[in-house]
């Protein structure tokens, strides 16, 4: 989803043709706006309102199904939703540092995800990390430790709610 419509007027490159900036002349003022909900309103939102806002904003495509890693159908429901708030990849940054910058927004996002399933929202985290879980009782935090692939969402799914041809779960990245 683009924040505005316009025409590319300049592409600025530096040494060795490294891209430094792209200048876009914005046409008009027809920006997209979305309904805003306060933190207190989020737990009372209906599933339809959440789905409509995610689809209109283009964020619905951040959700992925397991198995098959496809964008979920709008009329489908996951048996659980997984958020991997840890990364065991070599040289990976610490997600708890990134999440701490907007901890309240992260917790609000988990509460909104809980509207999309009648099951649980699992937040996979490293032992001892300070990851918020929101206000909704269906959001649960699970700790995983060990070398890679302990931080992969597929590992979390395997141990907490294994999928099959008839059972689908959804995943979303912690930065989405």
What are these regions (language model features)?
Residues 14-176:
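Buried, small/hydrophobic-residue-enriched core segments of structured protein domains
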Residues 1-10:
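Generic structural motif
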